[in-house]
């Protein structure tokens, strides 16, 4: 079964759902579809707020697709793949609507980047996070600016350097990544429903201005994240990285 992106609109709330059978890991085509869907709902007048979620209960997003990573054989293909996450982050940044992320399970790599790029992120208590890129021979170059903006430089460095260790949802809340955490998915969904309805009836012009203020200083990310994608694209070509990814896959 292939992955998919779907969306629906109800009472001013646009909900985008993504899915991939491999723990919601994201191949390049899904990343581009997700970025396009975020941009589309951002431009849809009847949408006042966006909720971003994934299917299942164990994993919010496992980051990049290892199958695609291993298949990368040239720099341009590598840059193209990693620019997918850049497109998603920039779409979230530029959408003139607040984006609420629903993190119902663990987040790895690019998944942490997506959670960090939302304007308000809810999570359950078992939604641990990990930036595992260094463990497979690359680095969190593309998602780094979004994660660092949310949790600060010290916490970002901790996640990046200690690439094999999970950090708890409580840690992520303490650092500012998660706005609130819940024991169950059902409790989280109630809170998301309450906030999204409040925002759907709030002043759209005020929210547009607030979003611009909140993201001030990121205007250069269109070019920055593509430069970062090229860095990851170059590293993924090395024998070290290919061997590390293969070893990681065999453990999984």
Model regions: which residues?
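Conserved CoA-thioester-binding segment of acyl-CoA-metabolizing enzymes
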Residues: 1-53, 90
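Catalytic-core regions built around general acid/base machinery
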Residues: 37, 84-96
């Amino acid at each position: 079964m292939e992955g998919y992106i779907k969306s629906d609109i109800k009472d001013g709330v646009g909900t985008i759902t993504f899915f991939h059978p491999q723990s919601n890991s994201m191949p390049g085509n899904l990343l581009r579809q997700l970025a396009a869907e975020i941009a589309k709902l951002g431009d849809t007048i009847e949408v006042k707020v966006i909720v971003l979620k994934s299917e299942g209960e164990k994993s919010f997003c496992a980051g990049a697709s290892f199958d695609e990573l291993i298949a990368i054989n040239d720099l341009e293909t590598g840059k193209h793949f990693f620019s997918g996450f850049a497109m998603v982050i920039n779409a979230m940044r530029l959408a003139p609507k607040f984006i609420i992320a629903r993190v119902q399970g663990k987040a790895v790599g690019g998944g942490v980047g997506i959670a960090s790029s939302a304007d308000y992120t809810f999570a359950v208590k078992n939604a641990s996070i990990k930036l595992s890129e260094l463990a497979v021979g690359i680095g969190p170059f593309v998602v780094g600016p979004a994660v660092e903006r949310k949790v600060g430089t010290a916490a970002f460095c901790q996640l990046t350097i200690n690439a094999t260790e999970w950090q708890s949802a409580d840690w992520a809340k303490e650092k500012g990544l998660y706005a609130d955490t819940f024991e169950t998915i059902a409790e989280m969904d109630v809170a998301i429903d309450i906030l999204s309805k409040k925002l759907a009836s709030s002043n759209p012009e005020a929210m547009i201005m607030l979003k611009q203020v909140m993201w001030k200083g990121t205007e250069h990310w269109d070019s920055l994240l593509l430069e970062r994608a090229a860095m990851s694209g170059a590293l993924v070509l090395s024998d070290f990285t290919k061997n590390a990814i293969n070893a990681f896959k065999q453990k999984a």
